[in-house]
Curated annotation (Swiss-Prot):
Enzyme Commission code(s) on record: 5.4.99.12
Function of the protein: Formation of pseudouridine at positions 38, 39 and 40 in the anticodon stem and loop of transfer RNAs.
Protein name: tRNA pseudouridine synthase A
Species assigned in the record: Bacteroides fragilis (strain ATCC 25285 / DSM 2151 / CCUG 4856 / JCM 11019 / LMG 10263 / NCTC 9343 / Onslow / VPI 2553 / EN-2)
Lineage of source species: Bacteria, Pseudomonadati, Bacteroidota, Bacteroidia, Bacteroidales
Molecular-function GO terms, alphabetical: RNA binding; tRNA pseudouridine(38-40) synthase activity
Superkingdom to which the source organism belongs: Bacteria
Active site (catalytic residues): D54 (nucleophile)
InterPro entries: PsdUridine_synth_cat_dom_sf (IPR020103), PsdUridine_synth_TruA (IPR001406), PsdUridine_synth_TruA_a/b_dom (IPR020097), PsdUridine_synth_TruA_C (IPR020095), TruA/RsuA/RluB/E/F_N (IPR020094)
Keywords: Isomerase, tRNA processing
Gene behind the chain: truA
CDD domains, sorted: PseudoU_synth_EcTruA
Oligomeric and partner information: Homodimer.
Chain residues that bind substrate: Y113
């Protein structure tokens, strides 16, 4: 019997999880998905995600893959069954078959994140927004964001002491836009992201918006390739992974 590979498209509210990756000291999205698959397929099944979201970070679209040996699966039935087995804060959109060597992480050509900030206290979105108390200069923040396109080494925005072999990333989009009277969104797209990178960039851009750093200071922080020079990471609760893109040829 042949081994087939499948992609799972899912969303989750990361509030009560210790991130995507399995952790020894807390429940993770990956663990929940593997348990649900093991129950449905009646055997332990490894799941590989397109990336590793940190504790408290959400995804409106994450992609993961798993392998199955046997008769081809009914993908609609798999999605339906997983949704019954998974907690209320994890949802599967669809399952699709891909080529045997397709990889959720290594074949992704682009990933997009959004970070939400708000200027008002509102009880119903507090776990998905970062509340800002002082005025921000979004024009300056966007000027600083534009400088990201001129660099590829983002060591200054990377979590220290990780197992990552390279800090090189290609940023394709980075911009603050106003969603409504009280909400601003930072959208960033790159071929790959480092651990904690988006939150570190947002935290440093907020320092520009507050007038504590100039656009030139922001540029110098990137050039220094030193995490200690950048701003404090923004909280994870306002960050969403919103898209992962793949070349069409990996799908069957």
């Amino acid at each position: 019997m042949s081994v087939q590979r499948y992609f799972i498209y899912l969303a989750y509210d990361g509030t009560h999880y210790h991130g995507w990756q399995i952790q020894p000291n807390g429940i993770s999205i990956q663990e929940c998905l593997m348990k649900a698959l093991a129950t449905f397929l009646r055997k332990d099944t490894e799941v590989i995600g397109a990336g590793r979201t940190d504790a408290g970070v959400h995804a409106s679209l994450m992609v993961a893959h798993f392998d199955y040996e046997g008769e081809p699966l009914d993908v609609d039935k798999v999605a339906e069954k997983l949704n019954r087995l998974l907690p209320q804060d994890i949802s599967v959109y669809k399952v699709c078959r891909v080529k045997p060597d397709a990889h959720a992480r290594f074949d992704a050509t682009a990933r997009t994140y959004k970070y939400y900030i708000t200027t008002v206290k509102f009880p119903f979105n507090r776990q998905y927004r970062y509340r800002i108390h002082n005025p921000l200069d979004f024009q300056k923040m966007n000027e600083a964001a534009l400088t990201l396109f001129h660099y590829s080494d983002f060591t200054s925005f990377s979590k220290l002491h990780t197992d990552v072999k390279t800090n090189i990333c290609k940023i394709m989009h980075a911009e603050w836009t106003q969603e409504d009277e009280y909400t601003w969104v930072f959208t960033i797209q790159a071929d790959r992201f480092l651990r904690n990178m988006v939150r570190a960039i947002v935290g440093t851009l907020l320092e520009v918006g507050r007038g504590k750093l100039s656009v030139d200071d922001f540029r110098k922080i990137i050039e220094q390739q030193n995490r200690c020079k950048a701003g404090t990471s923004a909280p994870g609760n306002a960050l969403f992974l919103v898209n992962v893109e793949y070349p069409q040829e990996i799908f069957e």
